[in-house]
């Protein structure tokens, strides 16, 4: 299965194949696969075992084939001898390889990713990867979710070839952070036909008091074979500061804005309305304040 994506830089449509597509079809579309998923693969134990395999020296041999398969441009990253596959996966990008808009009114992307935009309707429901979710289900907090009625939801889907570190979108301070434990499932379209993907996943959200966008909620969501979301202990931050990173696997970031706070760039809006994600980079302008 492939996913249709708009490449904003090249102004063209391309098709992305899903990581380990055949294995996912087996897990979600067969009786034996679903039994394995329920009893073992989607458990914390399996995720921890997988993390151990990706953190040992033997996993280094996986790096070169991975780079070749996903055509990763390693000239963008720091040159170093990686100690494991996970060390490679959480690699840091070279300074200057991502441009951050300095305009206070500009909304930037927190990560290299594929972006979709959703309006939060009167019923506080949003369409996330072909399933319907309320903001309350995502946050596990109905009272907090009501603050975002008629607001905007931005979904940034990171795939295995993306840079898996992410940043703050504005100057501000952390009000509080909450961790929600769940069962791990993949974020792509195959699994979303079978499960409420996000409500089943481990996730962590931060309530941010930002200078230009008010009270923003940023949610990091883990996926199949991802056991860790690593957020730095930062109370006060600047636009573009690193917020954290994901360990191995495709993962997702969700941003929630209150009503009439932001105005998205037209191209992103148009493709989102057509059900097509937009490929963007961390720090790239994707919208602005709705003045």
UniProtKB/Swiss-Prot annotation:
Instruction: Quote the cofactor binding remark.
Output: Binds 1 pyruvoyl group covalently per subunit.
Provide the function of this protein.
Catalyzes the formation of phosphatidylethanolamine (PtdEtn) from phosphatidylserine (PtdSer).
Supply the source organism's classification. Bacteria, Bacillati, Bacillota, Clostridia, Eubacteriales
Q: Active site located where?
A: 112 (charge relay system), 251 (charge relay system), 251 (schiff-base intermediate with substrate)
Record carries keyword Zinc: no
Name of the protein in question: Phosphatidylserine decarboxylase proenzyme 2
Native source organism of the sequence: Clostridium acetobutylicum (strain ATCC 824 / DSM 792 / JCM 1419 / IAM 19013 / LMG 5710 / NBRC 13948 / NRRL B-527 / VKM B-1787 / 2291 / W)
* Membrane-traversing stretches: none
Q: Could you say which EC number(s) this protein's record lists?
A: 4.1.1.65
The catalytic activity, as recorded, is: a 1,2-diacyl-sn-glycero-3-phospho-L-serine + H(+) = a 1,2-diacyl-sn-glycero-3-phosphoethanolamine + CO2
Modifications made to the protein after synthesis: Is synthesized initially as an inactive proenzyme. Formation of the active enzyme involves a self-maturation process in which the active site pyruvoyl group is generated from an internal serine residue via an autocatalytic post-translational modification. Two non-identical subunits are generated from the proenzyme in this reaction, and the pyruvate is formed at the N-terminus of the alpha chain, which is derived from the carboxyl end of the proenzyme.
| Keywords (A to Z) from UniProt | Cell membrane, Decarboxylase, Lipid biosynthesis, Lipid metabolism, Lyase, Membrane, Phospholipid biosynthesis, Phospholipid metabolism, Pyruvate, Zymogen
Q: Which GO terms describe its molecular function?
A: phosphatidylserine decarboxylase activity
> For this UniProt entry, which residues form the secretion signal?
none
Metabolic or biological pathway: Phospholipid metabolism; phosphatidylethanolamine biosynthesis; phosphatidylethanolamine from CDP-diacylglycerol: step 2/2
Please state the protein's primary subcellular location: membrane
Membrane-topology descriptor: Peripheral membrane protein
Question: Which residues are tagged with the site Cleavage (non-hydrolytic)?
Answer: 250-251
Subunit record text: Heterodimer of a large membrane-associated beta subunit and a small pyruvoyl-containing alpha subunit.
Q: Which GO terms describe its cellular component?
A: plasma membrane
Source superkingdom: Bacteria
